[in-house]
Amino acid sequence: MKAEDIRTKTQDQLTDDLASLKKEQFNLRFQKATGQLEKTARVRQVRKDIARIKTIAAEKSAAKKA
C-alpha cells in the first residue's frame, strides 16, 4: 500500500484498514509459530503498512486541530 493511496482515504477508511491489517498480522504470527507461513515477507509488509496508516492518521488529526 502506497502512502499516496492512504492519504486519499478518510479517517473511517483508515480505521477499517488498520483493523484488517492488525487481524492479518495476528494470523501471520500464528502461522509463523506453527510453521505454516509461506510468504515470510508479508509479515514485514503488513507491519510497515500499519505504520504508514498510523502516521498518516496522526498527520490528519494534527491538521484538523491546527
UniProtKB/Swiss-Prot annotation:
One Gene Ontology term of the molecular function aspect: structural constituent of ribosome
Cellular component aspect of the GO annotation: cytosolic large ribosomal subunit
Gene (name only): rpmC
Gene Ontology annotations of biological process type: translation
Name of the featured protein: Large ribosomal subunit protein uL29
Taxonomic superkingdom: Bacteria
Pfam families: Ribosomal_L29 (PF00831)
InterPro entries for this protein: Ribosomal_protein_uL29, Ribosomal_uL29, Ribosomal_uL29_CS, Ribosomal_uL29_sf
Keyword DNA-binding: no
The UniProt record lists the keyword Hydrolase: no
Record-stated family: Belongs to the universal ribosomal protein uL29 family.
Key words, A-Z: Ribonucleoprotein, Ribosomal protein
